[in-house]
Each structure stands twice: as structure tokens, then as C-alpha cells.
């Protein structure tokens, strides 16, 4: 059995983050216009600030189990789980048309938390090349999911907050190929390359871990 680190690339995540940020910023704009500027002259000088989220490569863990049927051949199974987290925030400061009224700024804020999760379950044959190295190939399913949570906080009207959550996912064929190197009689080094999906959902990466023989 081996336990290792997984580092994946999810190129389509950049577009998911961009689209989610744009959607939630538009939602925040509608919220602000409805709550602060629907009454003419109540608030003035709205100023918006904030930052956008950046896509990050998913990272996580890999667990692999190998069972030898004969001295040369066996079966191997693998479970991989990775996650990427990012967020964006937008703030608005307003001034009251009534200069005697004090406003707590930012008047409202919007936070978008974007989570990308990928997991896979694979199995396949293994082949012992010699006493130092074994090769294997696996196939199975890979699931990628992106979730965007929006939370708007209204600092002027305590009951005026708003939140929503949107998610999308894709299940695809996944595959992996790798090798195990015997460091000694009981410890192995395990490295593999894994891929899944296509287009915006294409996910690929490497896993590396240390295994123990029982």
C-alpha cells in the first residue's frame, strides 16, 4: 500500500473562475442598485473596490493498493482526491445625501468562494519487470466538480443579506500509468501520471508516494 501527494492541472478552471466572478459581480451590482440607489437622492458617491480570484492547480492525496497474484503479475487499485480553493471580494462605499447621517462603510460586500474538486477511482494490472521495478496501468472514472458560493453582506440593513450556491460537475473516463521502484525489501517509491476528461474538463497530473510491503 502506498500513500502519496497528487498535483494536478485543470486548465478549464481559469474560465470557471472568471465566469463565476463575473456572474457574482453582476448579482452584487443588481443588489446594490436595488438596495441603495432605488430611492433617488438617498445615497451618493458609490465607490467599488475589490479583487478577483485566481485559478490554482488542485492538490491532494493518492492512495494505492497492489496485490500480487503471481511473482510477476498482480492487480493495483488507486484513489486520488485533490482540491483547489480561491475567492474574490467586492466592496462598495456610499455616502448619505443627508450629511448628518453616519454610514458604516463598506456599505455592502460580496465574497465568492470557488472550490474545484477532483477525485478518481482506478484499477488495473501490474507487472514486475525485475526485483527493482514494477510497471502498471489503470483505468476507471474521474469526477471533476466546481462550486461557487456567493455571500453578500449588507452592513446598513442587517436583514438585507443574500447568498446563493451554484455547482457543476463532469464524470469522465480516467486512466493512469506508473511505476514502483523497490528501495529495499519493505519500502517502494511510487510515481504515476493520470489523466481524465477533455476540453474545459480536462484534468491531468502526477502522483508520487512511498509504499510499504506487508
Q: For the regions a protein language model found, what residue spans apply to each?
A:
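Hydrophobic, lipid-facing positions within transmembrane beta-strands of outer-membrane proteins
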Residues: 59-63, 117-123, 173-177, 204-208
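Outer-membrane beta-barrel translocator domains and adjoining extracellular loop/strand segments
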Residues: 13-21, 87-95, 147-158, 201-206
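Repeated loop/turn-to-beta-strand initiation elements of outer-membrane beta-barrel proteins
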Residues: 72-75, 132-135, 181-191
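Transmembrane beta-strands of outer-membrane beta-barrel pores
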Residues: 5-11, 59, 79-85, 141-147, ...
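Short glycine/proline- and aromatic-enriched beta-strand/turn motifs that initiate or cap beta-hairpins
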Residues: 1-67
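Solvent-exposed loop/turn segments connecting transmembrane beta-strands
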Residues: 129, 169, 195-207
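Outer-membrane beta-barrel "beta-signal"
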Residues: 7, 181-182, 188, 202-214
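Residue-level signature of outer-membrane beta-barrel architecture
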Residues: 7, 67, 125-127, 181, ...
Amino acid at each position: 500500500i502506498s500513500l502519496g501527494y497528487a498535483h494536478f492541472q485543470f486548465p478549464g478552471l481559469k474560465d470557471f473562475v472568471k465566469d463565476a466572478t463575473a456572474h457574482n459581480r453582476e448579482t452584487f451590482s443588481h443588489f446594490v442598485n436595488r438596495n441603495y440607489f432605488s430611492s433617488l437622492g438617498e445615497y451618493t458617491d458609490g465607490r467599488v473596490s475589490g479583487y478577483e480570484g485566481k485559478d490554482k492547480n488542485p492538490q491532494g492525496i493518492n492512495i494505492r493498493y497492489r496485490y500480487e497474484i503471481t511473482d510477476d503479475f498482480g492487480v493495483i487499485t488507486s484513489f486520488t482526491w485533490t482540491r483547489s480553493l480561491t475567492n474574490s471580494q467586492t466592496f462598495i462605499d456610499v455616502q448619505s445625501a443627508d450629511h448628518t447621517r453616519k454610514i458604516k462603510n463598506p456599505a455592502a460586500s460580496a465574497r465568492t468562494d470557488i472550490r474545484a474538486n477532483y477525485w478518481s477511482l482506478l484499477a488495473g494490472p501490474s507487472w514486475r519487470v525485475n526485483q527493482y521495478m514494477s510497471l502498471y496501468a489503470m483505468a476507471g472514472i474521474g469526477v471533476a466538480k466546481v462550486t461557487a458560493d456567493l455571500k453578500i453582506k449588507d452592513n446598513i440593513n442587517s436583514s438585507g443579506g443574500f447568498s446563493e450556491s451554484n455547482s457543476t460537475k463532469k464524470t469522465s473516463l480516467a486512466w493512469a500509468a506508473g511505476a514502483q521502484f523497490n528501495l529495499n525489501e519493505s519500502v517502494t517509491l511510487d510515481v504515476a501520471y493520470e489523466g481524465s476528461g477533455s476540453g474545459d474538463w480536462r484534468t491531468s497530473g502526477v502522483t508520487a508516494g512511498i509504499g510499504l510491503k506487508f
